Design a protein with these regions (language model features):
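Accessory terminal regions of nucleic-acid processing enzymes
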Residues: 1-267
Length: 267
């Protein structure tokens, strides 16, 4: 709650399917507790070191154990660089903006590349990684890290355990962040943090059902005045429902005909 980190930014940008901007806001102002540690989060954290060591080994990089390193560790001259877990970084002008990347890699030319490691489930792999895409909430996390750390070159390392029996389960995305994207993200996140400080709900373009439940958990059954915009939306909703109903009826008829044909072979 003491600022904005990389894992918050996907929600703030409306790109995180697991956390909306409304939920993130409610967590930041203390209205709801932060998410509890689950098995996916626990094992994702455990596997960071394992995958990090493998990435370093594959790229002739010295892996430095230990966490929250303040200065670049020494490493053997036979290696092309050193990989280590940096301490938490904060923006020099805005202390609320912080980043805790998984690793840095510094090469012999003193150039630093940020490394972020993700354990990838089968669903996310099929939807994004298998197509060469980056999950958008993870991309925004990297964008945020690039702004806070002033490092523009990043490698997103994915590890998909379900692939390990038939192929290399580790794969990478090389990312360089452009200034326009950084500015767009910064403006949105700064606006969100200002809302948190003032305890004013950020503007929501398309509230979800979960957002409504968070904001209005109980119905007071009070009457609220309408307006032309809401009247228009109500008419549109009626039109949509009128179109859906005959399609649902047709769907049911077709399903039953197919099941009837299949007989006992059907489900």
């Amino acid at each position: 709650r003491q600022g904005i980190g990389g894992s918050d930014v996907g929600a703030i940008m409306g790109a995180n399917p697991y956390c909306s901007i409304t939920k993130c806001y409610k967590e930041k102002v203390g209205d709801i507790p932060p998410p509890e540690l689950n098995y996916a989060m626990e094992w994702g954290s455990i596997l960071e070191d394992v995958v990090g060591k493998k990435y370093a080994e594959d790229n002739n990089i010295h892996y430095h154990g230990g966490s929250l390193v303040e200065e670049t560790p020494d490493y053997p001259v036979s290696k092309s660089g050193v990989m280590y877990e940096p301490s938490t970084k904060r923006n020099s002008k805005n202390d609320w903006a912080y980043a805790h990347p998984d690793f840095y890699v510094e090469n012999k030319e003193k150039n630093i590349t940020g490394i972020e490691i993700k354990t990838v489930g089968e669903g996310i792999y099929n939807k994004y990684w298998a197509l060469g895409d980056i999950p958008p909430w993870q991309y925004y996390q990297i964008v945020w890290y690039s702004m806070v750390t002033k490092i523009n070159k990043w490698v997103l390392v994915g590890f998909a355990p379900h692939l390990r029996s038939r192929t290399n389960p580790m794969f990478t995305h090389d990312i360089e962040i452009d200034v326009d994207t950084q500015l767009r993200v910064w403006d949105r996140v700064a606006y969100f943090w200002d809302c948190v400080q003032r305890r004013v709900l950020p503007e929501i373009d398309e509230p979800s059902g979960d957002d409504i439940k968070l904001l209005y958990p109980e119905s007071t059954a009070e009457v609220v005045p309408s307006n032309s915009d809401i009247d228009s939306k109500c008419l549109k909703l009626k039109e949509v429902r009128d179109k859906i109903k005959p399609l649902e009826e047709e769907e049911e008829v077709l399903k039953n005909k197919i099941k009837y044909y299949m007989g006992n072979c059907g489900i």
